[in-house]
Amino acid sequence: MAAYLLAVAILFCIQGWPSGTVQGQVMPFMEVFKRSVCQTRETLVPVLEEHPSEIADLFKPSCATVLRCGGCCSDESLACTAVGKRSVGREILRVDPRKGTSKIEVMQFTEHTDCECRPRSRSGVDSGKRKRNPEEGEPRAKFPFV
């Protein structure tokens, strides 16, 4: 048994870990650079961030994956910004705790299609957060009682 475990350990050292890099290996500069540039990347977006008026219901999952712009620009005065967008549908389970009902429905999310490094807003910080309309009320608690 000990010989088997030793063989498996040696095999991992020779072939590398499943991620494709040997544990402790340094990622080459070009790979780091390629992964860090301003581009669309899969991002988890909370359902209530896209649909803030739907606070009375619960959603499963509570977030969905969409492509969003992210990454670094060559200058601190620039921010990675979406220049192309589209609407995409995701199937989400909506639970109405008042009625005790649930149903799977298609909800629309904004997905970024193209990104560019553009000058940051005048405030100097581009938070990317959407401003809440006063008529929408207060946001729902993060851990509602169910």
Swiss-Prot record:
Keywords: Disulfide bond, Growth factor, Pyrrolidone carboxylic acid, Secreted, Signal, Toxin. It comes from the Eukaryota. One of its GO terms (cellular component) is membrane. Gene3D superfamilies: Cystine-knot cytokines. GO terms for molecular function: chemoattractant activity; growth factor activity; toxin activity; vascular endothelial growth factor receptor binding. It is found in: Secreted. Snake venom VEGFs that may contribute to venom dispersion and prey subjugation by inducing vascular permeability and hypotension. This protein induces an increase in capillary permeability after intradermal injection, in a VEGFR-2 (KDR) dependent manner. In addition, it provokes a drastic hypotensive effect after intravenous injection. The hypotension is mediated by nitric oxide (NO), which is produced by VEGF-activated endothelium NO synthase. Also induces angiogenesis in vitro. Unlike other crotalid VEGFs, this protein probably interacts with VEGF receptor-2 (KDR). This is Vascular endothelial growth factor isoform GtVF.
